[in-house]
């Protein structure tokens, strides 16, 4: 995960102070890039502990098409008992003031992935990868301009594209307009790595490269102390992803609906580093 630490270092050394929507303030650069070879291990950050269960739960929630906080809790914890999730601040700080209730967040990621203007982008992507692997339209977008003002949070990672090599490997590249380097980016890396593995399994391909392209890449001012500690730590060996058996998207979502169905074997990170999420 040296690629991730390099991004942190670039922001520290090259970033400029910026005001932001949350009022916290950031140090920011524009444009960031990283490439991970998934054959070398699963890119879970090791210089602090990754909230793995939350990564899995959120991705399954996206893939299900749900935009409700209650469903996110079920995917993450196996039950809804009002647990805190990474979407809880967005619900409490934005969604409620927009008039939403009962856990609704508006037409966020899941809605766009599974019903963008009536199109199920995920099913179309899977079919395209199977039937037209060399196609150049293997792309999913969450940036629905007509519905941005209805979302509790417009998408930070707003699109991804897939590529199939001649020898049966699957690559995935995602694009992100706003990159919270300390809390968000490790989560996003793991999420899209998991998505690449899931898509590869559903299409009979082998996961290969995961590529990240970021826009406004920033460290919040109140995260800087933790980041400076993190970049001093030496990365440890990457874990191996162990997934449950599933034959299609329905099987994945209906029979493996809890995050504990997915494991990181050999994951031995440095201790957790805590910080407040700006919403």
Swiss-Prot record:
GO biological process: DNA replication; dTMP biosynthetic process; methylation; viral DNA genome replication
Keywords: DNA replication, Early protein, Methyltransferase, Transferase, Viral DNA replication
Disulphide-bridged cysteine pairs: none
Binding sites annotated in the UniProt record for (6R)-5,10-methylene-5,6,7,8-tetrahydrofolate: 180
Record-listed dUMP binding positions: 21, 136-137, 177-180, 188, 218-220
GO molecular function: thymidylate synthase activity
UniProt xrefs under HAMAP family: Thymidy_synth_bact
Protein name: Probable thymidylate synthase
Species of origin: Escherichia phage T5 (Enterobacteria phage T5)
Listed NCBIfam families: thym_sym
Record's catalysed reaction(s): dUMP + (6R)-5,10-methylene-5,6,7,8-tetrahydrofolate = 7,8-dihydrofolate + dTMP
Induction: Expressed in the early phase of the viral replicative cycle.
Catalytic residues as annotated in Swiss-Prot or TrEMBL: 156
Class in the EC hierarchy, top level: transferase
InterPro entries, alphabetized: Thymidate_synth/dCMP_Mease, Thymidate_synth/dCMP_Mease_dom, Thymidate_synth/dCMP_Mease_sf, Thymidylate_synthase
Enzyme nomenclature, EC number: 2.1.1.45
Similarity section: Belongs to the thymidylate synthase family.
Known function: Sythesizes the thymine necessary for the viral DNA replication.
């Amino acid at each position: 995960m040296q690629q991730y630490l390099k991004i942190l270092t670039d922001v520290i050394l090259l970033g400029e102070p910026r005001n932001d929507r949350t009022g916290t303030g950031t140090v920011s650069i524009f444009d960031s890039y990283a490439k991970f070879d998934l054959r070398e291990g699963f890119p879970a950050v090791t210089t602090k502990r990754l909230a793995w269960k939350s990564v899995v739960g959120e991705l399954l929630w996206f893939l299900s098409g749900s935009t409700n906080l209650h469903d996110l809790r079920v995917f993450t914890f196996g039950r809804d008992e009002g647990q805190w999730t990474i979407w809880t601040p967005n619900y409490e700080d934005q969604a409620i003031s927009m008039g939403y209730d009962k856990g609704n967040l508006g037409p966020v990621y899941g809605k766009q992935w599974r019903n963008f203007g009536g199109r199920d982008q995920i099913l179309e992507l899977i079919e395209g990868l199977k039937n037209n692997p060399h196609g150049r339209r293997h792309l999913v977008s969450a940036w629905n301009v007509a519905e941005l003002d209805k979302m509790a949070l417009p998408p930070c990672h707003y699109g991804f594209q897939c590529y199939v090599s001649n020898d049966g490997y699957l690559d995935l590249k995602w694009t992100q307009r706003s990159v919270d380097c300390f809390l968000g980016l490790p989560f996003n890396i793991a999420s899209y790595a998991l998505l690449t593995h899931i898509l590869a399994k559903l299409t009979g391909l082998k996961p290969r490269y995961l590529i990240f392209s970021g826009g406004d890449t920033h460290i919040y001012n109140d995260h800087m102390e933790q980041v400076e500690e993190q970049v001093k730590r030496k990365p440890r060996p990457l874990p191996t992803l162990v997934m449950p058996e599933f034959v299609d998207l329905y099987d994945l979502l209906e029979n493996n609906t809890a995050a504990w169905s997915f494991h990181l074997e050999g994951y031995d990170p440095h201790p957790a580093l805590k910080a407040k999420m700006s919403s």
